[in-house]
Amino acid sequence: MLKYIPAIFAIILSSNIAIASKNYDYISLTPLRHVADLIDSHITNIDHLFNNRLTFYESSSLKSKFITKDKQYIIVMEVPGFDKSQIKVKLNGKKLFIAGNIEDKNKANDSDNYMNKNFNYVISLYEDVDQKSISARLKNGILTIILPRIEVKEQDSREITIN
């Protein structure tokens, strides 16, 4: 049953995104809200069944900010409970990959407990990011990624005649 929780959770997130969209009128949202409420109540019941061990459901996504300044972009993410060894920041082309994973297998009092907490973000970088100077730091559960900006030369443009 636990392997279906992320899929169910993704459905809830999709429903919330659809509800927030301006393209939907209020009347058409009623079925989506009903489905989201049903799924939410079932997950709450499952959580009670497992003695409130499904804490990952409560913290659905990480809080993050993207800040634009004159000389740099700054990504700030709240990643409570993660340490440096559990977070990877990789650059591949013009994409920045940020991933975190915690696995905790605990055997105590004749019961097996297992906890897995993870996140994955992919960010497409602007042309003016100095990819060689990107840095990251983790302090007090806050991951800060600094993306220095460089001046990008405008490409020469010319008009092409049509024959």
Curated annotation (Swiss-Prot):
Keywords: Stress response. CDD domains: ACD_sHsps-like. Gene3D superfamilies: 2.60.40.790. Transmembrane segments: none annotated. SUPFAM superfamilies: HSP20-like chaperones. The keyword Heme does not apply. Coiled coil: none annotated. Residues 55-163 form the sHSP domain. Belongs to the small heat shock protein (HSP20) family. This is Small heat shock protein C1.
